[in-house]
Amino acid sequence: MLRALLLSLTLITGLAQANTTQQSPISLDTDQGTLYGSLLVPQSDKPVPVALLIAGSGPTDRNGNNPEGGHNDALKKLAQVLARNGIASLRYDKRGVAASRAATPDEKDLSVERYVADVEGWAKLLRDDPRFDRLILIGHSEGALISSLAAPASQADALVSIAGPAYPVGQVLDMQLAMRLPPPLLAESRHMARCISST
């Protein structure tokens, strides 16, 4: 009996949520191609806050999934929780990833500056939408760094850093490379970093 009640409540809650939120595809045209995302908006008669979700490093898609780190839908789940609490959200595939792959198919053409410009472009799109009254940037890991760089030009009302770097970017890169590179390449990488920092 208890199982049937819990199952019924779960189904009703799911249906209620489906009726109170609307998910739609959204896109942003950039100078290198189109970026694609998902916009989740709670039903409301007045403007609501909107969160722009920025994924971390690597080939992480709009839902927070990375072929190197597994499938967990972390950003999708965050968007759903935000919607249940009256906050809209936009999550997107970064350039070079998933549906946005064609925007920058070659990894060597990716840069922090391009990622920042992308956040600023999405932010403008959201600020210009009358359904939204406040803009929140929520970045995970590298996305937290990108968010902090884009916040001033994006005119963000708030910034949330989830597992953002707490060390200087050079030290973060060194720690990440130390886990992946063989010793000779790591030594060469550290030598190049010292040369760059001394100029």
Label the model's feature ranges.
Residues A74, E107-D128:
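Alpha/beta-hydrolase active-site loop
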Residues N19-K46:
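N-terminal cap/lid segment of alpha/beta-hydrolase-fold proteins
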Residues A144-S154:
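Short glycine-enriched nucleophile-adjacent loop
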Residues D73-R101:
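Conserved alpha/beta-hydrolase
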Residues I162-T199:
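Accessory cap/linker subdomain of secreted extracellular hydrolases
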Residues D129-S141:
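Alpha/beta-hydrolase fold nucleophile elbow
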Residues S44-L82:
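Short, surface-exposed "cap/lid" segments of acyl-processing enzymes
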Residues I136, A158-V160:
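Residue in the alpha/beta-hydrolase core beta-strand immediately N-terminal to the catalytic nucleophile
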